[in-house]
Every structure is written in C-alpha cells, then in structure tokens.
C-alpha cells in the first residue's frame, strides 16, 4: 500500500524483531492514517529538500512489538505517529536542524549522534494531527535527554566541528 509518493506501508511496518519472533506488526486504519500524515507532513518535505531517498529504520510498532523490544506501549510509534530514519550521505544533525526549522512536528529527537560523528545515530520525528504539535526538540546520547540540538559549526553546508 502506497502511503505517499515515496513511502509504502511495508517499509513503515518492517521489523526484523517482529519477523524473527512471529509478531503481527499490522497497523489499524487509524494508525495507517497517522503514518500517511507522517509521510506527507514530514518525510516527503525532507526527501524533497535533500533530494535523496530516506531509509526508514523504525516506523509503526504494534503493542506486542513494543513489548518485545522494550519500548513503551505509549510510544508514538505504537500509534503510527513517529518514525526513525537516516539519509545516506547527509549528517543526521543536518537533517534534524532542517526539520526543526522547516516542517511542523510534535517531537524531534537526534538520537545517538556525537559531536565527533555528526552522521552517527538517527533522527526520530513525530507528527500529531489530532492536537497542537509541541515542537519539542531533544538530543539523546544513550543515557540522558537534553533540550535542543548540539551546537555545530557549518561551512558550505557541511558540519566542520
């Protein structure tokens, strides 16, 4: 099922853990609508701006999958409102900065990105059609969350330190 021009339901529900453990990771109709919103409101604008394919690392997660991976059942992933992704050749911090300044989102988390490796980690972003989006921006280093994104120096569109 095509969710938007460049994104399919299959890539938003794919999970190696679900496959390995025989977990049904099929979203309901409301979850699919939320996934469509994430695609149209966030992923398509990001793809258009960077003009590169996006690799989804985690999209929808059923309650059973959340339990299997130790994620909260209240996660926005469990409602189809959140996605984790990367763009090959684009530092994740650059993607996060662009999202923070250019699209409507509920929560944006730069996860496991280190100053000495701006391409490391991944971007988590969510969208909530039902209410006002919080525009919450966090950085997670694997131990704790900090408000905002790390300060980085840029030159010619590249992170320099």
Features from the language model and the residues they span:
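Extended, low-complexity, intrinsically disordered C-terminal regulatory tails
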Residues: 44-70
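Structural recognition of the beta-strand scaffold that forms the well-ordered cores
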Residues: 55-57, 82-86, 124-126
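Amphipathic alpha-helical interface surfaces
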Residues: 38-42, 65, 81, 91, ...
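Extracytoplasmic cell-surface/polysaccharide-interacting catalytic and binding patches
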Residues: 1-49, 142-161
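Short, flexible, solvent-exposed loop/turn segments with mixed acidic/basic and small polar residues
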Residues: 68-78, 113-116
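A generic structural signal for short, non-catalytic loop/turn and secondary-structure boundary residues
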Residues: 2, 49, 78, 117-118
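Catalytic cores and adjacent binding grooves of peptidoglycan-active enzymes
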Residues: 87-161
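Acidic, His- and aromatic-enriched active-site or binding-groove loops in soluble protein domains
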Residues: 73-93
